[in-house]
Amino acid sequence: MEVIRLDNVSLWRRTQEEFSYDLKKTLLSVFEGKYRQPAKKLVLDKINLVVKKGEKIGIIGANGSGKSTLLKIISGILQPTTGSVRVRGQIAPLIELGAGFDAEISVIDNILLYGVLLGFSRAEMQQRIQSILEFAELQDYTFVPVKGLSSGMVARLGFAIATDIQPDILILDEVLSVGDESFKNKCKQRIDNFWDANATVLVVSHDLSFVQQSCVRGIWLDHGQLRFMGNANETVDCYLKSLNKL
Amino acid sequence: MIISLKDNLTWLQVRRYWELLHVLVSRNLKVRYRGSFLGVYWSLLNPLIMTGLYTAIFGATFASYYGNSIMNYVLAAFTGLVVINFFSACTSQALSSVVGNGSLLNKIRLPVSVFPLSMIAANVFQFAVGTFPLLAVMTFLNSKSLANVLALIFPFLALVLVCTGIGFLVSALYVFFRDLPYFYELVVFVIWLSSPIFYPAAIVPKQVKPFLNLNPLSPIIESLRQITLSGSPPDLALIWGALLSGVIILTLGWTCFHLWRHQFMDLL
């Protein structure tokens, strides 16, 4: 059964140079007749991709080649300019843990907040609080505001919340282990459980040997184009060959 | 079958939206009142102090416009201040709400409109517990009629509509123009001075008056004062005027927000 299908997906985005924008400058440029439409850049170029249930896919490529953007398209954060995206099942994004935390409020309130942001109901989250605190080893900090935790503890909490569920589709963007050594092992175990539990996994990684070991299929993106798709080993070889040519 | 699935989906979306609103509002309130024992009642301090100040400075001069009663001036200034304070708090908090949560919007799929709305909702809650009871008591003492107390809901509803509309508009504009807060501060000041809060509307020259009517808060303040202070039954024409201005501004704000929100993600 296919869970993700991208048909001819292209995405145009405003370029980074346009990031200085204010009312004063815009008005001035309109008065001077120098106003121009913001420039746009092609970030993803006609991507076709079908992912079946349970597949583990590694996405590789140079920085800025559109790997994270592709994940954002699949998660529904970005809408494609042309083409269509279809996704079946719940997606758990595991991107930069702790982005949804508010440092001022307590750990327990943050668990509810983050959980609801990730798409669970409050009632569901209330039942999970204990297991999350336990996994993150933060039982003693239940009512402490998050700004009172060390950065490692915050990362632990983020990981514990985001992985406390069994999602249909797991999206990993370069975060595989956080915290100290003993916690890293716990993380790895949990990730391995996802791997075994027939979840569909999409990983963006620069760790090529990890992709070769853990993923079945590989995708190589280059300047927004799908350069190669196939067996993980072949994809990594192809990518490395092109690097050696330079 | 397909229809029932669709119904189910929209119901799920509504429930998710509601849950999001719930956690975001409770987050806003918790952050705001953590560690202050007066809690919500801090929000009353500002209009009370300002009313005292205005009364001390202008009270004696303007009392003749208020039936020679300083008390009437106090009440008129207070009702006006309550409205303008609510407006400026709501809209300036909504302004930064979309940009402030930009990194979050880049990581998790969320309905963008929930952020400005959660700011408005937090202020509504604060108003309902803090200021509203005081207004209700004032109204009841003045009019001796429960109908007036109940009618207070309508100008307040109109106020919420106006604030939501402006909140959507400025939160969307802020994504494109990051120097907007400076301009918006000026706009709030213009609205503040052009609403007859601490001066009687009668002192404004005839030529200037039509411009003051453009102020979306004027009909609301007028209706609120009529209900709270006049002692006569609520004037329906004033209420309709206030609600109409609310609906127009909300429609305008929401339309802009809706049309522009597809461009947000490239700039956050």
Regions found by a protein language model. Give the residues of each.
Chain A
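Pre-NBD coupling/linker segments of ABC/ABC-like ATPases
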Residues: 2-43, 233-246
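Helical segment within the ABC ATPase nucleotide-binding domain
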Residues: 184-197
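H-loop/switch region of ABC-family ATPase nucleotide-binding domains
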Residues: 205-206
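Conserved ABC ATPase "signature" region
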Residues: 25-32, 112, 124-141
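H-loop (His-switch) and adjacent beta-strand-loop-beta switch element
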Residues: 214-231, 239
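The feature captures the beta-strand-to-loop junction immediately N-terminal to the Walker
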Residues: 60-62
